[in-house]
């Protein structure tokens, strides 16, 4: 179960096991409804009109990522996506955004954490939550508010959380996705997708790497309209990290410490996916090889790929594949 993919797949199997044994599984929202975020402002501060536009963008981005079982949170400011949550969790994502802001000379002021459930997420066993640590992290990162999907997110230690938010001048608000239900894409199943992957060089991907590449390519394509997602890292059908704007090298380094426990073997596993061939450099190849990944997939043709980088990949035993065409779903 653990090796089969993301959290959603694992948890659905766990729930199914207990239900088959005659148990009724209930969620925290049913057991403690007073902890559930309701629509509207929960504290004293209020979101601005600009904040509301960012909130809808953040909700849409997480919705777009839902089929790939990644991301319950994003940090966004003035329409710019600053961080996308991977398997590291919300608090570490906020801290990462804060570090990037402090390092930048033109860092934006304000900004929002948008937190929502993924489409088809089973809220009985995996309900997103915010709490005091979320508020503290948002304040340290210079954010102005937290927008949480109404009826789908919990507030842990509600009184403490809201008191700290009020003291910091941070709004906490329950919001709804304005998009119709028909806008929610269905779950992505890499094994049912047919995609032309063209190897460059003598190293060929194994079947599990092909599936990782297919899922990663679909993930970055889903984010193209948001201007982010130039790099993704996928291991055993699990998307570990997606780039906002930190660059391919930083994204791969970040993902290196986020591997699933089922992937901690000496065998090379996982694929780094790049939207553009220009991102393929000798330095990146070295980072990918040292991190123990099996290869690199590129979402356009190989014309812009560095010959030196391709030669380095061959020396390191990494496969390189390109896939400039869109995928299609098969019937298998």
Positions of PLM-derived features:
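Short, basic, helix/turn surface patches
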Residues: 51-62, 166-187, 209-216, 317-332
């Amino acid at each position: 179960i653990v090796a089969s993919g993301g959290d959603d797949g694992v948890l659905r199997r766990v729930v199914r096991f207990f239900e088959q044994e005659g148990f009724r599984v209930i969620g925290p929202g049913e057991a403690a409804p007073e902890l559930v975020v309701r629509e509207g402002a929960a504290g004293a501060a209020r979101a601005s009109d600009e904040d509301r536009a960012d909130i809808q963008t953040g909700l849409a981005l997480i919705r777009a990522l839902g089929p790939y079982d990644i991301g319950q949170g994003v940090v966004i400011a003035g329409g710019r996506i600053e961080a996308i949550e991977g398997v590291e969790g919300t608090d570490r994502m906020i801290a990462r955004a804060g570090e990037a802001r402090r390092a930048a000379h033109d860092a934006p002021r304000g900004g929002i954490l948008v937190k929502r459930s993924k489409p088809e997420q089973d809220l009985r066993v995996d309900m997103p939550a915010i709490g005091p640590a979320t508020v503290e992290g948002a304040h340290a990162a210079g954010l102005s508010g937290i927008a949480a999907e109404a009826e789908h997110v919990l507030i842990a230690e509600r009184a403490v959380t809201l008191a700290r938010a009020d003291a910091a001048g941070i709004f906490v608000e329950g919001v709804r996705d304005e998009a119709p239900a028909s806008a929610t894409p269905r779950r992505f199943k890499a094994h049912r997708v047919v995609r032309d992957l063209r190897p460059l060089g003598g190293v060929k991907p194994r079947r599990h790497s092909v599936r990782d590449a297919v899922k990663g390519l679909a993930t970055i394509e889903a984010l193209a309209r948001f201007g982010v997602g130039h790099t993704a890292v996928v291991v055993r059908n699990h998307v570990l990290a997606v780039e906002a704007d930190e660059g391919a090298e930083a994204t791969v380094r970040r993902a290196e410490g986020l591997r699933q426990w089922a992937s901690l073997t000496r065998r090379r596993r996982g694929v780094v996916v790049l939207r553009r061939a220009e991102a393929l450099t000798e330095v990146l190849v070295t980072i990918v090889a040292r991190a123990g990944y099996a290869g690199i997939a590129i979402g356009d043709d190989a014309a812009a790929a560095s010959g030196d980088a391709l030669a380095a990949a061959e020396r390191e035993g990494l496969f390189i594949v390109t896939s400039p065409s869109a995928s299609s779903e098969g019937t298998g």
